[in-house]
Amino acid sequence: MESATKQRRDNRAPREQEEKQFEERVVSIDRVARVVKGGRRFRFRALVVLGDKKGKVGIGIAKGADVQAAVVKAVDMAKKNLVVVPIFNGTLPHEAQAKVAGANIFVKPASPGTGLIAGGVVRTVLEVAGYSNALSKSLGSSNKINSAYATIAALQSIASSDKWVVEPVSATKKATKPTKAKAQK
């Protein structure tokens, strides 16, 4: 009888499954066309949002001959475009707003237990980034690509986490609110 682990002829070790470090969400898949002399040539475009639920999030857009090829390329693109966003007690440290093309996105912190009150691609970006409580409003264009980029821009506009000081909870204070650290001269 052979052993439980089968020895390969070429003495290679068995392939190890790569554990998923990031959660990926396919936001949209579109069929796009380019017009050539003989008619139209179709390809697929995929928009993927990728994050680790710990403050890293990225967006990737790619085209491919079939859906799977487009998604794989978009995931690779999203991994190259990862940004770090601050998370404070599962929510945002303060309000933020950004506009990309026609999409105007407004994100705001929420108290614990509120959940994510956001629609469409904004909700997806906030979920994979790791936010559990946040409010958002999408104004202007509802284009998924521009909304995704505007959400990332709004999250990046938030001051970095080292500028936010958390005050210890005393017997008289019930809520902990972030206070902006004073600039030292």
Which stretches of residues belong to each language-model region?
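Conserved mixed alpha/beta catalytic, RNA-binding, or beta-rich assembly cores of soluble enzyme
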Residues: 46-82, 86, 90, 108
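Glycine-rich phosphate/pyrophosphate-binding loops
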Residues: 129-145
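Short, flexible loop/turn motifs enriched in small residues
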Residues: 38-44, 118
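A charge-rich, low-complexity, intrinsically flexible signal that marks solvent-exposed coils, linkers
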Residues: 86, 145-149, 153-165
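Intrinsically disordered, compositionally biased charged tails
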Residues: 1-20, 162-185
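Short beta-strand elements
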Residues: 31, 42-52, 107, 124-127
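Glycine/charge-rich, flexible interdomain linkers and switch-proximal surface loops
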Residues: 84-107, 166-178
